[in-house]
């Protein structure tokens, strides 16, 4: 099986026991909660990527960032002949909620924006059924049990519709 590498930079913003997430609109994590962040542009530094992606996906400006760390996951989507080794740099972030929130762009330089809304979700509500592997890594870390080894999702189900709660 072919393995493709993907590297991204992501922000972790926790307030009152809730994690700031975005709702993915496309890709393997579509219709799931994910972290604000994404891929670097050519020549862009890690924190430049962090600032740009967080603004694009949440509408909020970054005030500060700290505590950089690296995690990774291997994701093999059902019915695909390849897997993605997703390597992620995480930063704890503080956002400017006092300033005005920018409207989210419909398009960004690399195509359509792949996120819809920024939303606060309690850690208890985040599960393998509704969250990306990135969010699950953060949840484990915040619970005091960081998963330092690579996590593997060998039959990852891409959700083709947003699930509704009963």
Regions found by a protein language model. Give the residues of each.
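Conserved N-terminal beta-strand and adjoining loop/helix that marks the start
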Residues: 1-19, 65, 88-92
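Conserved Nudix-box catalytic region and its N-terminal flanking loop in Nudix hydrolases
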Residues: 18-56, 161
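Short secondary-structure junction motifs
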Residues: 30, 62-65
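Unchanged
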Residues: 40-63, 73-131
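Nudix hydrolase/Nudix homology domain
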Residues: 108-166
């Amino acid at each position: 099986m072919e393995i493709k590498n993907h590297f991204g930079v992501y922000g972790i913003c926790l307030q009152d026991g809730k994690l700031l997430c975005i709702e993915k609109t496309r890709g393997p994590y579509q219709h799931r909660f994910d972290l604000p962040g994404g891929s670097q542009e050519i020549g862009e530094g890690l924190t430049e990527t962090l600032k740009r992606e967080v603004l694009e996906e949440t509408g909020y400006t970054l005030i500060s960032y700290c505590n950089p760390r690296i995690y990774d996951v291997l994701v093999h989507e059902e019915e695909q002949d390849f897997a993605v080794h997703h390597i992620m740099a995480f930063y704890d972030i503080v956002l400017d909620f006092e300033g005005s929130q920018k409207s989210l762009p419909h398009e960004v330089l690399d195509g359509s924006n792949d996120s819809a809304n920024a939303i606060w979700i309690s850690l208890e509500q985040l599960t393998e059924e509704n969250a990306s592997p990135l969010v699950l890594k953060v949840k484990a870390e915040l619970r005091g049990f960081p998963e330092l080894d690579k996590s593997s999702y060998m039959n990852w189900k891409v959700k083709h519709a947003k699930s509704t709660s009963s």
